[in-house]
Amino acid sequence: VLGRVIDRFTDDGLTPVLAVELEFYLVSPRRARDGSILPARPAGGRTPTGVEVYGLRELDDFRPFFDDLYAACDAQGLPLESAISEFAPGQFELTLRHKPDALRACDDAIMYKRLVKAIAQRHGVEATFMAKPFADQAGSGMHVHVSVNDGDGQNIFASAAPEGAAALGHAIGGMIGSIGDGFALFAPHANSFRRFRANSYAPVAPTWGVNNRTVSFRVPAGPPAS
């Protein structure tokens, strides 16, 4: 299906540019007495607690895991970039570099997900990409960064005008119109819907906005080079 869509872009002289971000938790292979999931304990023995978003210590606690993950991704040609700790204990996100090959970018995301799970097992923990593994903690999502380049390599969505580029408006309108059908792919499980709640950085309506993390389709603001 994606291949046919890309062919239609190619026929119009356009190239989709794509990157995928996947949030995940590192959790203990043991379970609590009630069967609930427990956060992973790093080699140093410190149990993560509280919101530790963007914390460096949280990354350093699991440094052996991340070192092996980066090495494995490099060996398989996966363009892994920055790593951050997220909004809950043991939750992380690593970014894959943008590619002017949407099909390969999606394949990279699938391969990366398998690698994360395999490397986690090697370090005695488990990685879960479940949308809502903890009822009282942040959910995990997948962010897809999309732009479209013309034949000269220029982003047709970019514009310095306050109202933005017309092509961007059409793209957003099309995605909003198809978001209902998209749930079959983007929220395929009962657990997926546990993440959709107000004030949780998960969208609860077919909306869009500029630099607004609560909407379904976010237009990031940035310098012209971005």
Place the predicted regions along the sequence by residue.
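Glycine-rich, acidic/polar active-site loops that bind/position phosphate-bearing ligands
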Residues: 1-226
